């Protein structure tokens, strides 16, 4: 300030002293004013700067609130937008509220249906936990994030609902993990997360040597949840562990039984309700036995129990010391069941056609390879097999999880279920809405991959005809309760059903079940549909067996690839090749040795150049990576519950 004062005091030297004094005073006033103005300008400038900074921060905060990140979500926004786009995410529609099938139901059965559909939601809650212990916490997390307008969580939830869980494989066999850092566990949600197959085997060996026989029996059955118990493991029956939800299901089934118009279906509801209240596998057996007798009931209800996902339990089959110890204690390990809940309306016309095959099953049983070495469920005296065609209302839990696909039909109960030991049979349920197809898309597929002269023999309905043979062949052949095929058990069994269904096409034509035209359509359609987009993962039993069959049929001249890269089926070569493969499969099951099953799968699970040529074409035809199921009727029923 001193230099500034000096500068401001310089004046004309000709002025007198008085004037200089006045000017000096005035200069001081001016100085004060100028300083005040400068300070004011600085303050205003700082204020404006602060205002705009705060406004920018506020805008940034608003931006973050409208599109927040989802820290626990495993897929980026770009990938989520792609996978949830209709081009990549297909839709399967089940029965709608205005469907004639629903309208035709008796009012009492509609009332019963209300409680059955509600029961499905409780079972899905159980299966979420069996599938992965993190499913429900992650689902709740997504729902909380969606309430905060989190778009990433919203799109993730669409995929979660479609695949019914965090982890799944898409149609290109890519593993999809919706939660960040989360992977599929070998013991799914029924074993401790950190338990490996090797540790599992060591613990069981230790427990058996210490005579903890019953504990091991409980750990290795198909219906228990397993936990650590110090240096050991312990098990709790899932009916006991999920008692609250199972009781809710039982309560709903009891209510439904009060309204059901069909006496047999009502009896089944009561038996199933009883089985869900007490941890006793024999109660399930009585319910399953009754269920397997149901044919022309108005309503369809199945609690599905199948064991494809758990690889911890089946790992015992390649540990000879453990095998010997288990055999000495008469313990047969069975992989853990995953649970599903199917609800529908029985379609009479479709069921009529299905049941026509029943009379021919004893003849097919006679023609099974090595039939003199084992007993079969299907004999001349008794046919413990029935089947229904169902219009679907809801698929909850495991049966409704779209993980690279949803099954066209199911043949239950499986060999490990106790109902088969008390005279119970099996029942096939076929899914009408799942087998629906798009005619335009089918034609594009044929133009792309099938020799023009054979287009006439490709028919999507032939998939259904073939599936009838496939499902019934599950009931043919040896019933191996103590399967030692490990992770190859399901691959071998599904292969048996496929090759049996194909091998007996000629027999069923000669017996009058199929027409000659249907025979040709089944053969061509099955061979064409054996071509996949990509080589599947070994965990995908249904797809692995498809590659194996494709390779085997090619080696036996059942088809060729034309110069322009299209499939030509050598129709009359297919059935003999299928029967030869069926013979190999049955021998693997009868020998019941892990090493032979492994060798067999590795021998034929080969992705050839021909498969890649067709697979690449199929990828250009459809971009669909996953699909979701819409159940409008079920949603409406639940909204009015």
Indicate where each model-derived feature is located.
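Intrinsically disordered cytoplasmic terminal tails of membrane proteins
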Residues: 1-29
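Short, hydrophobic alpha-helical membrane anchors of single-pass surface/secreted proteins
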Residues: 29-38
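Core hydrophobic alpha-helical transmembrane segments of single-pass membrane proteins
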Residues: 37-48
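Ser/Thr/Pro/Gly-rich low-complexity linker/stalk segments immediately outside membranes or between
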Residues: 55-82
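N-terminal helix-rich structural modules
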Residues: 73-272
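Fold-level signature of zinc-dependent metallopeptidase catalytic domains
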Residues: 76, 86-115, 215-481, 487-495, ...
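Extended, compositionally biased alpha-helical segments that mediate assembly or anchoring
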Residues: 378, 586-641
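Long, well-structured alpha-helical subdomains associated
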Residues: 502, 506-604
